[in-house]
């Protein structure tokens, strides 16, 4: 024990001799003078300032030289080795474990931690830094930087105090005397400054978002919230937004498309049932109640349902009788389900076969020689169950089948027009039969005449008598297919057959009711189910009339086209007024065979309107029908308007209901033994040639003449509207394709919307704003003038003048597009007329303009400096780029009434 103590004493003596005296020199950390030394167990001396800053301000107790943890340190001026210092005898700071060698060193330590005012040395030190800060703000208007106060661990005497201006410069740019500090950086998302870039980066990483793909590539892009980061993922990378991934963050973004596909395959793959369920579309629809057709001898689905119910009841009875035996047999339920499936499959097959049979029957009926309008009149009163019944007139009793609304019908109501035989019959209606009768398919070109019968006052109905034998629905006779080029019919028999055909259409299956009774019956009938046989019908709406609404052309329509010989005989000897009247009244009879006709008038009292009155009848009748919206040739109206039969353009409709049938006196013979008058062929609204007048002028320049020689009587007809609609290289005219009385311009039709209508409107508005230099007052004035012109409050000339006043010479640059995008054909014509008048006033008139002054629409738009053309069919002003699409719209609409050349090509 004594030996150990002696060895320890000798080691301490050697260390005391070998260790140099602590004190003097400079600090290895701050390079300052060592007024007082801080020494720890590792014997690495540092100045007391650095040790105090580490242990008191930074709360770090390791050695700044060797990083050894120092639990105790000694402050003194000249210190031996730490092991030789008797620390238990020294003054002690318990909070920080600092020992002081003497009182002077302790005073230096206390002075480092005092809060003294640099401007007021006579004041005692403040106990807290907050008190000093308040004193500096109130007494000296000096402030310290909050960021530096929070992050910089320095003594109070080392703090800098700034005025307001200097503090702002310090935060943004830094101190002029300290080039190492360049200000505190700003976060643009939060509008908050941080001590340095490291602190700003910590904030961005912690409180904002960055792309981990771009960050791994070295890009330093940050986003304020995840919405912007999601948009970045969507644009630059691959983002999954299916199912739960639409609400996930970070994990639903992928670097490559292959990773995205692998993710979708792994996480979003569905089973076949789920995929099939996702492809299904739920449709809410209902069927009208289906009436039984058992009385007509047709096997329907109700028969199968009745058999199925009987089988189920029989199985239930047998099951109650031998319940124990069926309990032992476990497969009876499976057999029952198999039987149910077989019955359901049989029902579906039967219903499909029945629908196919009905469709075939309707198509056969349409392909027969029955006229379209008579087929419509026969379909509308048809009922699904029971016998076929005819509509009754108002005031008719329930016992009578059919009676005249104006009393008994005499022979004068249906006079014969020729010397043909007259057959008078008085009988009741024949019993209905499923076979088609000859009345449903009258021949239009029969050589023999059959007139309507006279009915005695005691008769109950009317029936037609035909000289030919009755035929089945699929039996065709020779008179149903007349020769296309044949000799002219006999003068005496042809008018008789024509009148017989109109009267058979008017009195088919009996006398016709009044318009009021027809409307009542039509409103009381149940709607027919829209099936495959109905063309163009709508679900739950009224039944379609016939194939005419869909624009088709049946065999009967082809046969109703007159031959070239018959048309040429029609065109030659007729007068203007009488032939136009006969053509119109016969078209009314052919288009509406089920409607009543005009009252009885003698031939000398028949009104003969002039050509202008005939043209103006169509707009007057159009104003009374319900308004429909026409977009690119397709009408968007009510179901009642759609269900009405379509009429060819130019056909005036009657202004009101007429109570009496058409008498023969309304169709007088115009030329004695001349051929019969027939309605104009399809594609021609009115064909008029004045007797003794020169033929119409030749086609205007720009229209291509027909390729082949026209048939006799058609030398003055122009080509179809399809070729006339295309602009010519030299000039563009508005000549229509139908032969008209000279001086009559075609009526403007509905506006057909061109392609890219909305985008072009926006471009036009932007061009107007640019020309007005974004002047809102001028633009508002332009819009008000445009609205007044559209509403008819100002004329086209006033509107044209106001636009020129606003836009000046720039108006000429946008006038063509403004005119083409004006959604009103009539307003287009007015505005073009105003432009033509302005150009005629600007330029001196020459001989050519005087020659064309008769019709302003024959003036070329290119001569007026316009980049547009006028459609000769509907009078719509078009840009040159819109001509082809506009022509296609007309071609689609003209399929309902094709030209004679198209019919000839179809027949041959």
From Swiss-Prot:
Q: Which GO terms describe its biological process?
A: protein K63-linked ubiquitination; protein monoubiquitination; protein ubiquitination; regulation of translation; rescue of stalled ribosome; ribosome-associated ubiquitin-dependent protein catabolic process
Composition bias type Low complexity, residue spans: 313-329, 482-501
What is the species of this protein? Mus musculus (Mouse)
Q: Which family does it belong to?
A: Belongs to the ZNF598/HEL2 family.
Lineage, opening ranks: Eukaryota, Metazoa, Chordata, Craniata, Vertebrata
Relate the protein's function as given in its record.
Answer: E3 ubiquitin-protein ligase that plays a key role in the ribosome quality control (RQC), a pathway that takes place when a ribosome has stalled during translation, leading to degradation of nascent peptide chains. ZNF598 is activated when ribosomes are stalled within an mRNA following translation of prematurely polyadenylated mRNAs. Acts as a ribosome collision sensor: specifically recognizes and binds collided di-ribosome, which arises when a trailing ribosome encounters a slower leading ribosome, leading to terminally arrest translation.
The gene name on file is Znf598
Q: Which reaction does it catalyse?
A: S-ubiquitinyl-[E2 ubiquitin-conjugating enzyme]-L-cysteine + [acceptor protein]-L-lysine = [E2 ubiquitin-conjugating enzyme]-L-cysteine + N(6)-ubiquitinyl-[acceptor protein]-L-lysine
Zn-finger (C2H2-type) intervals are: 185-208
Residue spans with biased composition (Basic and acidic residues)? 358-385
| Zn finger spans (RING-type) | 27-67
What is the protein name for this chain?
E3 ubiquitin-protein ligase ZNF598
């Amino acid at each position: 024990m004594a030996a150990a103590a002696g060895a320890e004493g000798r080691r301490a003596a050697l260390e005391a001799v070998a260790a140099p005296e602590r004190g003097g020199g400079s600090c290895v950390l701050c390079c300052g003078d060592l007024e007082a030394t801080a020494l720890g167990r590792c014997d690495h001396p540092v100045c007391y300032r650095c040790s105090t800053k580490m242990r008191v301000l930074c709360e770090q107790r390791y050695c700044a030289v060797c990083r050894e943890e120092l639990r105790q340190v000694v402050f003194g001026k000249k210190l031996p080795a730490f092991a030789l210092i008797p620390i238990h005898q020294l003054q002690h700071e318990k909070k920080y474990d600092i020992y002081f060698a003497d009182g002077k060193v302790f005073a230096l330590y206390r002075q480092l931690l005092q809060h003294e005012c640099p401007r007021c040395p006579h004041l005692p030190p403040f106990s807290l830094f907050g008190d000093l800060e308040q004193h500096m703000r109130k007494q000296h208007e000096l402030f310290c930087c909050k960021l530096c106060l929070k992050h910089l661990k320095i003594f109070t005497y080392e703090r800098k105090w700034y005025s307001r201006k200097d503090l702002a410069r310090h935060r943004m740019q830094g101190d002029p005397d300290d080039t190492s500090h360049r200000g505190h950086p700003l976060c643009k998302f939060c509008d908050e400054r941080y001590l340095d870039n490291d602190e700003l980066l910590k904030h961005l990483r912690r409180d904002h978002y960055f792309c981990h793909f771009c960050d791994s590539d070295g890009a330093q892009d940050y986003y304020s919230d995840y919405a912007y980061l999601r948009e970045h993922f969507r644009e630059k990378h691959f983002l999954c937004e299916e199912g739960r991934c639409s609400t996930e963050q970070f994990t639903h973004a992928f670097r490559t498309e292959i990773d995205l596909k692998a993710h979708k395959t792994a996480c979003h793959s569905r089973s076949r049932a789920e995929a099939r369920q996702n492809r299904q579309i739920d449709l809410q629809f209902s069927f009208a109640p289906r009436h039984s057709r058992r009385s007509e001898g047709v096997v329907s689905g109700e028969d199968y349902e009745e058999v199925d119910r009987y089988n189920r009841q029989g199985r239930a009875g047998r099951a109650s009788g031998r319940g124990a035996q069926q309990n032992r047999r476990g497969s009876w339920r499976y057999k029952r389900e198999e039987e149910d499936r077989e019955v359901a499959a049989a029902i579906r097959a039967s219903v499909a076969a029945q629908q196919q049979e009905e469709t075939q029957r309707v198509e056969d009926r349409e392909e027969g020689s029955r006229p379209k309008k008579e087929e419509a009149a026969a379909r509308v009163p048809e009922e699904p169950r029971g016998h076929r019944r005819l509509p009754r007139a108002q005031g008719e009793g329930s016992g009578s089948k059919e009676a005249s609304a104006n009393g008994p019908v005499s022979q004068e109501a249906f006079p014969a027009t020729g010397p043909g035989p007259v057959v008078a019959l008085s009988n009741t209606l024949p019993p209905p039969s499923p076979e088609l009768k000859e009345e449903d398919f009258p021949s239009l070109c029969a050589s023999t005449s059959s007139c309507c019968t006279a009915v005695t006052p005691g008769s109950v109905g009317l029936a037609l008598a035909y000289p030919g034998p009755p035929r089945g629905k699929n039996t065709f006779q020779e008179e149903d297919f007349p020769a296309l080029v044949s000799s002219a019919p006999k003068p005496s028999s042809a008018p008789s057959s024509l009148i017989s055909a109109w009267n058979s259409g008017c009195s088919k299956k009996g006398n016709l009711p009044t318009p009021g009774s027809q409307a009542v019956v039509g409103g009381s009938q149940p709607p027919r189910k829209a099936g495959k046989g109905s063309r163009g019908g709508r679900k739950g709406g009224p039944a379609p009339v016939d194939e005419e609404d869909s624009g088709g052309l049946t065999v009967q329509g082809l046969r109703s086209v007159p031959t070239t010989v018959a048309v040429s005989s029609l065109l030659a000897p007729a007068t203007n007024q009488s032939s136009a009247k006969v053509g119109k009244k016969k078209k009314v009879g052919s288009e509406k065979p089920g409607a009543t006709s005009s009252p009885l008038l003698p031939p000398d009292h028949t009104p003969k309107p002039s050509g202008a009155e005939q043209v103006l009848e169509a707009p007057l009748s159009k104003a009374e029908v319900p308004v429909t919206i026409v977009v690119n040739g397709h009408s968007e109206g009510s179901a009642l308007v759609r269900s009405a039969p379509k009429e060819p353009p130019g056909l005036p409709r009657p202004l009101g209901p007429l109570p009496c049938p058409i008498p023969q006196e309304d169709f007088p013979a115009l030329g004695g033994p001349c051929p019969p008058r027939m309605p104009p062929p399809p594609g021609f609204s009115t064909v008029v040639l004045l007797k003794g007048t020169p033929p119409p002028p030749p086609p205007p320049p720009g229209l291509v003449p027909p390729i082949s020689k026209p048939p006799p009587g058609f030398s003055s007809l122009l080509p179809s509207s399809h070729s006339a609609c295309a602009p010519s290289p030299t000039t563009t005219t508005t000549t229509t394709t139908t032969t008209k009385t000279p001086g009559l311009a075609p009526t403007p039709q509905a506006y057909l919307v061109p392609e890219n209508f909305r985008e072009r409107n926006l471009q036009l508005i932007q061009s107007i704003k640019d020309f007005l230099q974004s002047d809102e007052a001028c633009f508002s004035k332009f819009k008000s003038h445009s609205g007044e012109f559209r509403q008819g409050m100002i004329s086209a000339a006033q509107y044209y003048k106001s636009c020129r006043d606003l836009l000046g010479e720039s108006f000429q640059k946008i006038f063509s597009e403004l005119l083409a995008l004006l959604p009103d054909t009539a307003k287009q014509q007015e505005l073009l007329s105003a432009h033509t008048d302005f150009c005629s006033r600007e330029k001196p008139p020459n001989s050519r303009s005087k020659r064309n002054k008769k019709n302003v629409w024959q003036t070329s738009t290119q001569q007026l400096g316009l980049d547009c053309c006028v459609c000769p069919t509907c009078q719509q002003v078009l840009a040159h780029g819109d001509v082809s699409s506009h022509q296609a719209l007309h071609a689609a609409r003209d399929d309902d009434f094709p030209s004679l050349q198209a019919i000839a090509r179809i027949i041959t």
